[in-house]
Amino acid sequence: MDFHNILVMASEQQGLNAVPKRYSLAVGPPKKVPKVKGVESAAVQAFLRRKEEEKRKKELEEKRKKERLLAKRIELKHDRKARAMASRTKDNFYGYNGIPVEEKPKKRRRTCENVSQAPEAEYATENEAEQLEFAQTESEYEQEEYDEKPSKAAVKPKAPPKSAPAPLNFADLLRLAEKKQYEPVEIKVVKKIEERPRTAEELREREYLERKNKRVETQKKKSEKEVKSAGISSSSKKATSLKECADAKLSRSAADKHAPPKSSLSSLSGTDKKPKAPALTEKHSRSFSSSKLSQMEKGKTSQNSSLKSPAAGSHSKLPANGMGKTGSSFPVPSSKPMANGAQRLPSAKESSLKKPVHTKPGNAAALQHETNSSAKRPSSSLGKGGSGHPAGGSSAGPGRSSSNSGTGPGRPGSVSSPGPGRQGSSSAAGPGRPSSSSSLGPGRLGSGSGVGPGRPGGSSSTGLGRPGGSSGTGPGRPGNSTNTAPGRLGSGMGTGPGRPGVGPSAGPGRPGSSSGTGPGRPGVSPSAGPGRPGLTAVKPRCTVVSETISSKNLVTRPSNGQINGMRSPPGHRPVFRPQGIGRPPVGYKRQIDDDDDDDEYDSEMDDFIEDEGEPQEEISKHIREIFGYDRKRYKDESDYALRYMESSWREQQKEEARSLRLGVQEDLEELRREEEELKRKRQSKKLRTR
């Protein structure tokens, strides 16, 4: 727009605005408001409407608040219940005997709720008005509950109480007394259960006995079923009765056998056990003859195994001195033999209990086969003189070295083959079992628990100039050795009275030879002459492991290494494997492999330290000096017992108190020593100053 036009328009407007507006300052007449008598309807209606609106709003607000409070109360109830449950379970966690918590009657419970809800009302509300309101709603709510409950109660009428049985007349009582007069009264004897923790051995014994009882019961049931179903002839009846009788006898003998190892574990000395050996052989022979009966085949196998296993336990108690004892004696299947019968076997009981666990019904057929075969043929290791003696105790359960003990009068120890030029592989005595008779030089007796008059049993080695097929082990030692060509003893040949032998004792000219005696002479049982029992010269190397960890529950059996002709590594212990059907004899194979093995000369092994020459006492002495541990002072615990060790609170407290007392004593001794040292120093200072 132009500036000129603007000016023109402004000038035009100027003339119009020139006349000013004027207001009169005079006061006008007063206005009169007309007064109406009565109430103005419009104002009242407006006021009432406002009031109603406010009321409605208030009610809505109240309703919302009430709902909110009720929801809160339900929530609180849940929380309280949860809290109560949590606290109850925490408080009652110990000492809960399985007694259910008594429910209070409903009225009392409701009053409790009322009491507990009063403080919650305060907690839930913000101001007094709300509190009042909450109390009202609460009471309403409770009234509703009261109304509901009686109606429910009215629906369920109470069951009439059972009337007590009518009391007997005096005459009836007398009659009943006459009737019952001569009837025997059964008094139930309450068995006192010992409230003490059982040892591992006891637990195992209990399991074994339970299993045996079950077996007997099942057999009885089977026989009864057969009797019922077949409508049996008298002959079959006789057979079953025979079977039951035999079962009962066997179980009784097994139970009897169980008791002596347990009771006479520590008290009986080695010499007390001498008369037991012949009786045991008789028992074995009896069991073999009975095993031939085809009728009782299945029933007997399991019982035979249970009979033999405790018997083996008592074998293991026979001492190792053969002085003046020419009866049949057995090599012992425990892993710790004794020297000269002085040291008792603590593992006798344990081995006897361990064995039944392994002889399961699954192995029954194999057991039967073993018993039959060994009963029918005499052991192959019998020499010219011993061909008439069948192996008395040669059949044992799996995992037991068979003892080919000759029962002839002049035959100490296990059966030996004295003929020269004979290879004595006695592994044919029973399939898959290490046999305890060995091939011998002329005039030498075999390895057994009693080896000639006055000669303690180490294992005797090969004869002159011939390889021995299977090792003769001393009592209870795993036979790791395989006798080889002249001048050489097989690996871990004979061991001393202490440990399972593993260390290879070599003959002259071999690396690491420590006990090379003359060619073919036994380096193990060097009895210096009749009447002087010489201790065995070659003793196994010992590691700390074999010193501290007990090797009791290992059942003796040569490991696979030996079977394949390999030497077992140092520190290796034979492992028990339950076998069903045994392996064929492997004496010849072992001999060939071992020859090859020995001919190989390993230059790297020149500087390998072998301490097999050191006697056991020497090693024990070193360990005692280093660790302050004397193995003679401690009772040998099996790994099983240690794993399942149980002790009561009182025992623990006793132990605590004892250790505390010892600790205090040690502290006092230390203080005394320190004081003595100080005194000595002072005295020495005084002497110097003078």
From Swiss-Prot:
<feature type="compositionally biased region" description="Basic and acidic residues">
    <location>
        <begin position="244"/>
        <end position="259"/>
    </location>
</feature>
<feature type="compositionally biased region" description="Basic and acidic residues">
    <location>
        <begin position="186"/>
        <end position="228"/>
    </location>
</feature>
<keyword id="KW-0238">DNA-binding</keyword>
<keyword id="KW-0175">Coiled coil</keyword>
<dbReference type="Pfam" id="PF22878">
    <property type="entry name" value="SPT2_N"/>
</dbReference>
<keyword id="KW-0539">Nucleus</keyword>
<feature type="compositionally biased region" description="Polar residues">
    <location>
        <begin position="545"/>
        <end position="565"/>
    </location>
</feature>
<dbReference type="GO" id="GO:0001042">
    <property type="term" value="F:RNA polymerase I core binding"/>
</dbReference>
<comment type="subunit">
    <text>Interacts with POLR1A. Interacts with histones. Interacts with a heterotetrameric complex formed by histone H3 and H4, especially when the histone tetramer is not bound to DNA.</text>
</comment>
<keyword id="KW-0805">Transcription regulation</keyword>
<comment type="similarity">
    <text>Belongs to the SPT2 family.</text>
</comment>
<feature type="compositionally biased region" description="Gly residues">
    <location>
        <begin position="489"/>
        <end position="521"/>
    </location>
</feature>
<dbReference type="GO" id="GO:0042393">
    <property type="term" value="F:histone binding"/>
</dbReference>
<dbReference type="GO" id="GO:0031507">
    <property type="term" value="P:heterochromatin formation"/>
</dbReference>
<dbReference type="GO" id="GO:0005730">
    <property type="term" value="C:nucleolus"/>
</dbReference>
<feature type="region of interest" description="Disordered">
    <location>
        <begin position="105"/>
        <end position="167"/>
    </location>
</feature>
<feature type="region of interest" description="Disordered">
    <location>
        <begin position="186"/>
        <end position="619"/>
    </location>
</feature>
<comment type="function">
    <text>Histone chaperone that stabilizes pre-existing histone tetramers and regulates replication-independent histone exchange on chromatin. Required for normal chromatin refolding in the coding region of transcribed genes, and for the suppression of spurious transcription. Binds DNA and histones and promotes nucleosome assembly (in vitro). Modulates RNA polymerase 1-mediated transcription. Required for optimal growth in the presence of the DNA damaging agents actinomycin D or mitomycin C (in vitro). Facilitates formation of tetrameric histone complexes containing histone H3 and H4.</text>
</comment>
<protein>
    <recommendedName>
        <fullName>Protein SPT2 homolog</fullName>
    </recommendedName>
</protein>
<feature type="region of interest" description="Important for interaction with DNA">
    <location>
        <begin position="1"/>
        <end position="579"/>
    </location>
</feature>
<keyword id="KW-0804">Transcription</keyword>
<dbReference type="GO" id="GO:0006360">
    <property type="term" value="P:transcription by RNA polymerase I"/>
</dbReference>
<feature type="compositionally biased region" description="Acidic residues">
    <location>
        <begin position="593"/>
        <end position="617"/>
    </location>
</feature>
<feature type="compositionally biased region" description="Low complexity">
    <location>
        <begin position="229"/>
        <end position="243"/>
    </location>
</feature>
<dbReference type="GO" id="GO:0005654">
    <property type="term" value="C:nucleoplasm"/>
</dbReference>
<feature type="coiled-coil region">
    <location>
        <begin position="40"/>
        <end position="82"/>
    </location>
</feature>
<dbReference type="InterPro" id="IPR013256">
    <property type="entry name" value="Chromatin_SPT2"/>
</dbReference>
<feature type="region of interest" description="Important for interaction with histones">
    <location>
        <begin position="580"/>
        <end position="690"/>
    </location>
</feature>
<dbReference type="GO" id="GO:0140713">
    <property type="term" value="F:histone chaperone activity"/>
</dbReference>
<feature type="compositionally biased region" description="Low complexity">
    <location>
        <begin position="397"/>
        <end position="442"/>
    </location>
</feature>
<feature type="compositionally biased region" description="Gly residues">
    <location>
        <begin position="443"/>
        <end position="457"/>
    </location>
</feature>
<dbReference type="GO" id="GO:0006334">
    <property type="term" value="P:nucleosome assembly"/>
</dbReference>
<dbReference type="GO" id="GO:0006355">
    <property type="term" value="P:regulation of DNA-templated transcription"/>
</dbReference>
<dbReference type="GO" id="GO:0003677">
    <property type="term" value="F:DNA binding"/>
</dbReference>
<dbReference type="InterPro" id="IPR054552">
    <property type="entry name" value="SPT2_N"/>
</dbReference>
<feature type="compositionally biased region" description="Gly residues">
    <location>
        <begin position="465"/>
        <end position="477"/>
    </location>
</feature>
<feature type="compositionally biased region" description="Gly residues">
    <location>
        <begin position="383"/>
        <end position="396"/>
    </location>
</feature>
<feature type="compositionally biased region" description="Polar residues">
    <location>
        <begin position="369"/>
        <end position="380"/>
    </location>
</feature>
<feature type="compositionally biased region" description="Basic and acidic residues">
    <location>
        <begin position="271"/>
        <end position="285"/>
    </location>
</feature>
<feature type="coiled-coil region">
    <location>
        <begin position="650"/>
        <end position="690"/>
    </location>
</feature>
<dbReference type="Pfam" id="PF08243">
    <property type="entry name" value="SPT2"/>
</dbReference>
